[in-house]
Amino acid sequence: MIFGIDVASMLLGGVAAGMVLFIVSVGLSVTMGLMGFVNLAHGGFAMLGGYAIALAMKHWGLGFVPALVFGFVVTAAASAVLERLLYARLYRATELDQVLFTIGLVFMMIASVTLLIGPENQPLALPAILQGQINLGITQYRTYSVVLIVVGIVIVSGLWLGFERTQIGAQIRAAVDNRRMAESLGINIARLFTITFAFGSGMAALGGGLGAEFLGLDPQYALKYLVYFLIVVAVGGLGRVTGVFYAALLIGVLDFVLKKYVPQGGTAFIYVLTILLLLWRPQGLFGAKVT
């Protein structure tokens, strides 16, 4: 019985961590699939959004949910401006140029936050209703983790419906599958790029705030978890919302279990598995087969 409770707790913890990975990574998957742009600054938008949420709660007295909305909107708006002013100039550049630009942008984000706020971890105070534990029958588990799982399910359901049942979702899917054909059908690709990039960055900000309780929130966040976000995208497939969801859950649970039983080598094991997977299926587990 004790073993069953321990397994259930680990699975719940891994699923909750996977939800955070999904919320942050889904925007990166869609923007990379749509734009073909290697955006290593995505973790930076998650970090900046998390800071916006934490500071809005701490200094302006915003509640948790309004602060999440604030962080999403501010980050999405700022990223839309950056996309038009800077990113758009590099869409036809080499991948090396894109990598150098975005990694330089990350270093600027880290340096700016460190200078203005400091290098310390930024606490994010949860409301009382999300603290404590909830009875799940076989075990007691943190209320916030359970809520986070529910929020993740709601988000993936909403995104799936948005991509499958709305006009802009159809346009994004068409552009991801065949950009030239989408352009020939009259789809405004530049406008679509800006909207998608802003939304993806806003989702990263939301994940940065929601996941601060698990991952912490400091200036190095922008680089610290970047590899995990890229792994989720690689395993889930570019532009695949449900693929990223399943990949995030898989990586979240695997990471949680391995760090408990193999704390010194768990992360390295995930890296090795990812390399082997991509050698076998370069498009990822859930990506469309490359022809």
Model segments located where?
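Helix-loop-helix "hairpin" substructures at the membrane interface of multi-pass membrane proteins
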Residues: 17, 139-217, 241-246
